[in-house]
Amino acid sequence: MGKKRTKGRSAPDTVASESAEPVCRHLRKGLEQGNLKKALVNVEWNICQDCKTDNKVKDKPEEEAEDPSVWLCLKCGHQGCGRDSQEQHALKHYTTPRSEPHYLVLSLDNWSVWCYKCDEEVKYCSSNRLGQVVDYVRKQAGVRTSKPAEKNNGHIELENKKLEKESKNEQEREKSENLAKETIPMDSASQITVKGLSNLGNTCFFNAVMQNLSQTPVLRELLKEVKMSGTIVKIEPPDLALTEPLEVNLEPPGPLTLAMSQFLSEMQENKKRVVTPKELFSQVCKKATRFKGYQQQDSQELLRYLLDGMRAEEHQRVSKGILKAFGNSTEKLDEEVKNKVKDYEKKKAIPSFVDRIFGGELTSTIMCDECRTVSLVHESFLDLSLPVLDDQSGKKSINDKNVKMTMEEEDKDSEEEKDDSYMKSRSDLPSGTSKHLQKKAKKQAKKQAKNQRRQQKIQERFLHFNELCATDYTEDNEREADTALAGEVEVDTDSTHGSQEEATQIELSVNQKDLDGQESMIERTPDVQESPEDLGVKSANTESDLGIVTPAPECPRDFNGAFLEERTSGELDIINGLKNLNLNAAVDPDEINIEIPNDSHSAPKVYEVMNEDPETAFCTLANREAFSTDECSIQHCLYQFTRNEKLQDANKLLCEVCSRRQCNGPKANIKGDRRHVYTNAKKQMLVSLAPPVLTLHLKRFQQAGFNLRKVNKHIKFPEILDLAPFCTLKCKNVAEESTRVLYSLYGVVEHSGTMRSGHYTAYAKERTASCHLSNLVLHGDIPQDCEMESTKGQWFHISDTHVQAVPITKVLNSQAYLLFYERIL
């Protein structure tokens, strides 16, 4: 029998040394890999089998509320609670008389091996038999890494020190808690606690984000509402003839939402000092399989997948409720019921709890310089991805010159292209927003012959289509073709006519997919496209949102060697053939119809033409020019994100109003075949709905050619941020005549190291929950100037299980990757 020790979990510092050799003489008798493999099939991890049999897992007294350490027998796979528990089932399992003794056990908390016979720690490395067995158990438990002990050595040491302090020196812990209470006097109901999170294996990116979400008390409040059984939602009818709203009884929330609620509850408990978010991470991996395998990941992507996953579950929940309200629980539905369900789903009576907390709105304002018509595009966002400039001004100017020279050459050679052969060398234009297209553009020389063959097939296809449609053209169209203006490029005898510039612009707007033989939809609707400078500036969730309307041609300048394509007249035939194929000739020019993709996972965009005063269309709530010079501040990043742009040259606006005026009336010819007018325009993206919780993402990870790099430049960010200089004059959720939209910093995610090997940590602010923020989210009460709350609190630096109090100066000097601000005014 082994001697009873007060701490069976403590491990010496050299437990994970790669060069250490096992010194225990009981390895041969105490290790049985065959029995382990059989025992670990469909096993429930981290639960004492004997306690579960005795029904003591749920009926524990309050003083044993914290889960005891669980030890795995390496002989038979038995899981028992350790010596620090009341029952000590792991020790009893060893002392039970058997023909073959069970000497060795493995801690499922810190993966240390203990020999009861030697009564001491057993050293191992990944190359020997014991290390291989431990690695196998870790993989079965869901923690996959080749050198487990070495990678987690620091975390093991920190966790063991914390456990020793917890068991041997209770008074010191009470003193630290009292000190925190003195620093931040809180009410017990609104107290926000800070705990460590276990690293499941390269999951620091997950832990850092969850630390900040756990410091968002309004999220916990809304999740309590979501979990309430029998929730009834009233949806206004889409048909004006119906007056009674539809009452929808919602089902329980989805598994990801429930796991999130359970995690926040565990973070609020007083007994646990370290939380293991295994269930929540498992649900995230089910929603997004890219996070499986315990590899290094991006914390901002994790945040987006998490929020989008919970929002999708809420949308599905409402859809099922609407279906049940119509009395159809089966999958087979008639068309009438399907249409009704879709109509009610489009009403969106109540936004999801994710949108209510993190959701804001961006408005892109575009004004034609010729007719002064103002058009708006509204789109929602959950976070803003801001550019981080890294002394690239020199490179940008060089790229600008290259683009300009290429444009001039293309204009000069456009007439010569009529007689050129189809086989002509060119460099394809990458979109600037897709890494795939960037790589494809660089490999275009190798695929030139293949692409040309595909283009020839497309040309034959659409020329055949034009021949079929030629008989439908009126005599007016034929006369137009015969009397084409000098300098116009005649694409086809019965197809659209346009100037060289127009043909070039149409050609440039074709998607890269056309080169692969795929059709692309080109809608004839007024719109603007992101300017070259705007590439890499908009947030990840809004970079491609303006694609709902016809883009004016753009020329990306973010990449070295990006040149405009040189097209022959045959290729222009293809482009205009595509244009004729996809245009709807029956559209009334008096109506501006925008086709919005119906995507349940992304918020729809709203397009409208406003009779706004052109002088105030681009005004903001507060002056913004002061932030145009300081390039190392978060305000300058916001300034770049919301700057006023000029749409000109290759990025002109296709103006519907000017196009109608060019045709001398609102009606085009029968086939809708008319001249498109591109004009210079102004464009600006501003915040039109300030979110309750503002999440800012600094785009530090960038691609330069084939290489990936991280921008390590320090970006200054304030404790109190005023968003007013970046909001529209008619911003929602802002008090009348207010010129301030204030946010208080409460969370930071920091990335240290390189892109290939780095570590995520979090800074979180322990504070009193804001009642004004809760009123804004729950009841829509807009905070007033006289109601601004205090932002006092204590900051903590959290690196997985290690939690340390830090001053605000250290927080402000950190290399921020994600910033979390809560609305205070």
Curated annotation (Swiss-Prot):
Disulphides: none
Q: What is this protein called?
A: Ubiquitin carboxyl-terminal hydrolase 16
HAMAP family in UniProt: UBP16
Span of domain USP: 195-824
Q: Which residues bind Zn(2+) 1?
A: C24, H26, C115, C118
Species of origin reads Mus musculus (Mouse)
EC no. given is: 3.4.19.12
The subcellular location is: Nucleus; Cytoplasm
Q: Which SMART domains match?
A: ZnF_UBP (SM00290)
**InterPro entries from the entry?**
Papain-like_cys_pep_sf, Peptidase_C19, Peptidase_C19_UCH, UBP16, USP_CS, USP_dom, Znf_RING/FYVE/PHD, Znf_UBP
Record comment regarding domains: The UBP-type zinc finger binds 3 zinc ions that form a pair of cross-braced ring fingers encapsulated within a third zinc finger in the primary structure. It recognizes the C-terminal tail of free ubiquitin.
